[in-house]
Amino acid sequence: MKNLRSQIPFILIFNFFSSGCHTLLDTDRNLLIQQADHLEKKGRYYWERRINPDHAKKAQIFLSIAYELKPEADNLAILYSQACYFNGLYIEQIPEKKDSLFLEGYHIAKGIVYHSKSFQKGFNAVEDNNLIRELRGIEALEKSFVPALYWWVANLGRYLINKPVVE
């Protein structure tokens, strides 16, 4: 599993250098999009079979790599955030790794919400402190972003649940 994830960057680097070190052309972008689509498809395939812990882990790996290639795809990002939550809650046993998964899912989902136009409109409408601005942004959020908002809060809640109130 780790071998697969560690090989992907080397393959991409090899492709870059073997192609003459030129900048991305339209054909290169199309190839990256095709690779991302294939990785997303594999991630969804394993996600549908997440009853098997190995499949849940593979789904998260494929979805994370696809997300790195296509960070603007909100549905992919939401699924990746959900996979982080699932693996952190049900699969992973080591507390530090659980926290890492919950934080990853939190940051992904929060990024979706923060980059939405409706959130930004509400967020920038007031000049108060950041908490009030954030609440205004959430109030202005379109209904289509509710799943991202849910996974933002679910991942953050699971991360914070075992943390001390005062250190």
Regions found by a protein language model. Name each.
Residues 1-8:
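Bacterial N-terminal signal peptides that target proteins for export
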Residues 9-19:
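Bacterial N-terminal signal peptides
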Residues 21-36:
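Bacterial Sec signal peptide processing site at the extreme N-terminus
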Residues 34-61, 80-167:
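Short coil/linker segments at helix-helix boundaries
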Residues 61, 68-72:
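Surface-exposed, polar/charged faces of alpha-helical domains
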Residues 72-73, 144:
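Short helix-capping/linker turns of helical repeat alpha-solenoids
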